[in-house]
Amino acid sequence: MRKIFIAGLAAGVVSSSYLLLAQQPPPPAGQPAPPPPPMSFFVASAGSGKGADLGGLAGADRICQTLATAAGSTKTWHAYLSAAAANGQPAVNARDRIGTGPWYNAKGARVAQNVADLHGDTLEAARRGNNMTKVTAINEKGETINGVGDTPNRHDMLTGSQLDGTAFTDGADHTCQNWTSSTSGTAQLGHHDRTGGGNTSWNSTHPSRGCSQENLVATGGAGLFYCFAIN
């Protein structure tokens, strides 16, 4: 079983070393800079407009794919969302549906090298950590997403996940009925700017007030979520 406290260490620590890792090495003198790596991570610039009702995981993946394709990507995209076991189907862990990395944003900055670093699976991985900040967690157009201090604040990201990227197993609803409801339930949220809340986690900070668009806005979000290229 993964250690949640190690994942929490990675979630709460952002150092200059991570920023250095995200930079491309300078080209030799007299040579043009190499092109940035293709985008493989972004925050969705728009959700479903129906709160946490995304049409299930498949609907959320379609949103990621549509936005990425419009931005010129030819990769296959999945939403970073967990789902609870239901109707005879096993739980789905967000961490298991996003490929293996590395992941780069629309400006070529590396967000994480692999799944272990993204979540801080081990002490070593937690020390390396990820580069998830307001500066790097941008949308597919390369635009910054509003965070704490901006109006309106939109830093809440739908994840339905624990710190280690797995689905909750306590029997409570953390996914607004597996992303099909805009009425009953709650959704677990992360903060893309890693500001506010107890653990300043990018993927598991606090639950929403509800599942409607109005509830998500009132909590400090807009029904947005993370998208990762799986190839």
Task: Please identify what each model-predicted range represents.
Residues 1-4:
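Positively charged n-region of N-terminal signal peptides that target proteins for export
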Residues 8-18:
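Bacterial N-terminal signal peptides
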Residues 20-231:
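Secreted/extracellular ectodomain signature
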